[in-house]
Amino acid sequence: MSRTCLAVILAAGDSTRMKSAMSKVLHPVAGLPMIAHVMQAIAASDIADVALVVGRDADKVTKAASIKGLSVTPFVQTERLGTGHAVLTAREALARGYDDILVAYGDAPLITPGPLLAARAALADGNDIAVIGFHTEKPTGYGRLLVEDGELVAIREEKDASDEERKVTWCNSGLMAINGAKALDLLGRIGNANAKGEYYLTDLVEIIRSLGGKAVAVDAPEAELAGCNNRAELAVIEKLWQERRRHELMLSGVSMIAPETVFLAYDTVLAQDVLIEPNVVFGPGVTVESGAVIHAFSHLEGAHVASGATVGPFARLRPGANLGEGSKVGNFCEVKKAEIGAGAKINHLTYIGDAFIGAETNIGAGTITCNYDGVNKHETRIGANAFIGSNSALVAPVTIGDGAFIASGSVITDDVPADALALGRARQEIKPERAKIIRERNMAIKAFSGKV
């Protein structure tokens, strides 16, 4: 789109209903602050400049909103005198001469570029105001969009609506696009002759019509326009976001056995032919390549899973876990900041942290990389085709060469050369009849003490 546009994002609310120590727009949806979701939609709508109207937590909100591709200028709203007043807080930016002014809200993280582009297209068609609306079966509480002959003639708040107007199911979302050349003049004409003494952006529709201009409404899915005022609504928005993203991934070739139990982050990348079993949680920063399987009850964050690898069930991949092709991290295993080579197997009950494990190496059950000395972390390096016996403790920093064999139960504190066998435990002793003596002694103690 060749037209210039300024997005004015309203994010100055006190968030009192959220009952939180931080602004509601900083609360995460799928691991990303609400305001950042809105900004992603703005950036994808051919908009580069943003006037961010902020109040509490101004610096934090501005930082969260400053995503790549956007130039964000904050404007602090010191008084709360309505939406019209909030937009005028960015007067300096509005005066720069943009073709379009798009007003949106920082607490509506489900918005997509579609409705925003549609509103801008309506301005390009010669309209002065384009209001984004939605149809709903439950319009109670919303302002109604009153349309005659295809033009929007008014936005009627429910308390002011007639019985006939209350039957209208096309409702105001609060988002709108305004002719940039007329924006400051129109905003300056909004009055506050109402019960609250506030300046309402919705008055612009009747103002522009009184001046001979045109207003229209464009439609959008109700779910995309959901705002968030409290924790219950935040949970609903999270649910809607997850449902939408799961659906997109399944249509792209990802299999989910029980999709309603899979929880994704804003940046989760799952390739075609990935299989996700029930009750899997993805934190931020996870990429899973084609043909990989994530078994049930696994948790992944900041991890990469290569083609054909398997994870879980009941596995945890922490930031820096990088699984090679065909590798396996099995049940009750935790991997953190570790490179796992192609075909390597970590099947059971193991902690691997700050480590490099070569291709085709086998890590036995109960193996622990002892990476922390109480102050610093240290690295464990294991070569290709090595075998680490069960219940081994590898005390870092330590290097185990290609093809080396670590006997079960060993505590390894020194480097092990390639193809060497290392045993780090006491030799087994057999003492005939000793068990019988111990048993008889214990029974005598028990009888003497009177304990059963």
Swiss-Prot record:
EC number: 2.7.7.23, 2.3.1.157
Pfam families reported for this sequence: Hexapep (PF00132), NTP_transf_3 (PF12804)
Record carries keyword Nucleotidyltransferase: yes
Binding residues annotated for Mg(2+), in chain numbering: D107, N229
Keywords: Acyltransferase, Cell shape, Cell wall biogenesis/degradation, Cytoplasm, Magnesium, Metal-binding, Multifunctional enzyme, Nucleotidyltransferase, Peptidoglycan synthesis, Repeat, Transferase
Region Pyrophosphorylase, annotated ranges: 1-231
Top-level enzyme category: transferase
Subunit relationships: Homotrimer.
Reported function: Catalyzes the last two sequential reactions in the de novo biosynthetic pathway for UDP-N-acetylglucosamine (UDP-GlcNAc). The C-terminal domain catalyzes the transfer of acetyl group from acetyl coenzyme A to glucosamine-1-phosphate (GlcN-1-P) to produce N-acetylglucosamine-1-phosphate (GlcNAc-1-P), which is converted into UDP-GlcNAc by the transfer of uridine 5-monophosphate (from uridine 5-triphosphate), a reaction catalyzed by the N-terminal domain.
PANTHER family in the cross-refs: BIFUNCTIONAL PROTEIN GLMU, NUCLEOTIDYL TRANSFERASE
UniProt record similarity statement: In the N-terminal section; belongs to the N-acetylglucosamine-1-phosphate uridyltransferase family. In the C-terminal section; belongs to the transferase hexapeptide repeat family.
UniProt-recorded name of the protein: Bifunctional protein GlmU
The species this protein was found in: Allorhizobium ampelinum (strain ATCC BAA-846 / DSM 112012 / S4)
